[in-house]
From Swiss-Prot:
Entry's family note: Belongs to the SUI1 family.
PANTHER family to which the protein is assigned, alphabetical: DENSITY-REGULATED PROTEIN, DENSITY-REGULATED PROTEIN HOMOLOG
Any one biological process term the GO annotation gives: regulation of translation
Name under which the protein is recorded: Protein translation factor SUI1 homolog
Source organism (scientific name): Thermococcus gammatolerans (strain DSM 15229 / JCM 11827 / EJ3)
UniProt keyword annotations, A-Z: Protein biosynthesis, Translation regulation
Lineage, opening ranks: Archaea, Methanobacteriati, Methanobacteriota, Thermococci, Thermococcales
């Protein structure tokens, strides 16, 4: 007999997972001395990194991609990224910005 999953339980589970994610935000130098903001620590098995990246790129008006299980955004967005991730449901206390 197949297991019936309550959609509400699944949503609550995702919210709890969001609040437990330890996220690290830092800067790397890209080609030609340009900066990129790196966001890592979001579980790619539980969350759609492409969707999160798409939302962040729209809010920050920048380009970016998902590579090796991390989100890369063009430019230095450390000052705004913590609030934007919190707006997406991640715990601000667990977001470390370097």
């Amino acid at each position: 007999m197949p297991r019936i999953v309550n959609p509400l339980d699944e949503m609550l589970f995702k919210e709890v997972l969001k609040e437990q994610q330890r996220i690290r935000v830092y800067i790397e130098r890209a080609r030609y001395g340009k900066l990129k903001t790196i966001i890592e620590g979001i579980d790619e098995k539980e969350f759609d990194l492409e969707d999160i990246a798409k939302k962040l790129k729209a809010k920050l008006a920048c380009g970016g991609t998902v590579k090796k299980g991390r989100i890369e955004l063009q430019g230095d967005h450390r000052d705004r990224i913590k609030k934007l991730l919190a707006d997406l449901g991640f715990s601000e206390e667990l977001i470390e910005v370097e």
